């Protein structure tokens, strides 16, 4: 088992190094080097990364790509706005049964939903119960501006099935955690994460006749709540 873990670390390290080569020599825009908790960078990103214009550019690129891949997004400031936005998304979609990850912010928002919702606890939730959920709520640790992709790390929260099984996935992402490229994002992924989930819009598949079907192998809809720091 030890040799297997060492081999996995070596492979992931090689992938990170190769993907980040293209990003060397340019400053990532609007991104803090790491975040142990959503929206709380652990280190100073430097003057170039802190510039509001640069950060605005990378957020704009990200939202443009979200729209291009069929995802929806809403900018919110603080937990109160996020709670209202979450309730609105679920109500508009007719989603009643909701499960949230173990991330503290997600737990706070899901537990605050009104009586019109059935709030499922992730702890002890059966496979059948998970498939009966209308929506799954998680955080995303990183966003990739080039492709409108969400990056979810296994070391940060229990979220993998919640982002894949329910027909609606709602992800909370700090605007300070949006990277330019996949290489930038992987350079910031926690070494403790054994699995990384990359989500680019709702699930899509097509047959040999190129008939596109949405939601067969994953969520039919992806909503991203972009959290900005309150002034």
Region roles according to the model:
Residues 1-231:
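The feature marks the mature, well-folded catalytic cores of soluble enzymes
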């Amino acid at each position: 088992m030890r040799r297997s873990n060492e081999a996995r670390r070596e492979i992931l390290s090689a992938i990170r190094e190769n993907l980040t080569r293209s990003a060397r020599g340019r400053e990532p825009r609007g991104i803090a080097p790491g975040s142990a908790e959503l929206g709380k960078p652990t280190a100073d990103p430097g003057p170039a990364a802190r510039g509001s214009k640069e950060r605005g550019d990378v957020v704009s690129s990200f939202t443009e790509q979200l729209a291009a891949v069929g995802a929806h997004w809403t900018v919110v400031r603080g937990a109160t706005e996020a709670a209202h936005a979450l309730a609105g998304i679920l109500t508009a979609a007719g989603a009643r049964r909701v499960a949230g990850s173990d991330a503290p912010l997600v737990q706070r928002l899901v537990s605050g939903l009104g009586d019109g919702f059935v709030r499922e606890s992730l702890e002890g939730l059966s496979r059948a119960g998970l498939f009966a959920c209308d929506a799954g709520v998680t955080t995303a640790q990183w966003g990739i501006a080039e492709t409108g992709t969400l990056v979810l790390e296994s070391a940060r929260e229990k979220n993998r099935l919640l982002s894949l099984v329910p027909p609606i996935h709602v992800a909370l992402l700090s605007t300070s955690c949006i990277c330019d490229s996949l290489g930038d994002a992987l350079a910031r992924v926690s070494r403790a994460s054994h699995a990384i989930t990359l989500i680019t819009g709702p699930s899509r598949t097509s047959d040999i006749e190129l008939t596109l079907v949405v939601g067969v192998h994953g969520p039919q809809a992806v909503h991203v709540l972009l959290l900005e720091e309150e002034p």
